[in-house]
Amino acid sequence: EILKEKGKYSTIRKIFAPIWIKGPIEKFVDGKTVIVGDAAGQAKPTTAGGIFTSGMGGVFAGQAISKFLKTNEISHLQEYQKRWTERFGKEFDKQLLARKILERLDNQTINKLFESITPEITNEISEKDDFDFHTSSIIKLLGIKGSLKTAQTLISGEFKKILG
């Protein structure tokens, strides 16, 4: 009925909401309530993307719910958060740290960081690294020499804030 009235490709209603990027919430499971995806803080802190991390959250939650329904043992629901945290917890911790650092930088400092990236490094990361695990790419991107140059850039940016 609605589609006939509105037309085949009409927008019925648009909904907008912010995406939580401060990391996973404390409890994915509360009693028999299971929280997944953006609501559970499974969007990546660096990019706010979360198709893979939230999707895997859905898979882990579904498996835990299935076990719970077969056994009626509520402890099976807790396996969901345990599995998700084992898979993504350390990466999210690193991404949260990266985000905290990057949020403090001014545009000029960020531009200098990007200018230090060589085409060779970009190609290596594009060919070999995992899009959903950014911190390994960042470490590879900077390398030892890059880390020194990056530290100088970050420090000079912070000094400018203090002095100016």
Task: Identify the meaning behind each predicted range.
Residues 66-164:
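C-terminal helical "tail/cap" subdomain of flavin- and related membrane-associated enzymes
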Residues 1-61, 65-70:
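FAD/FMN-dependent oxidoreductases across multiple families
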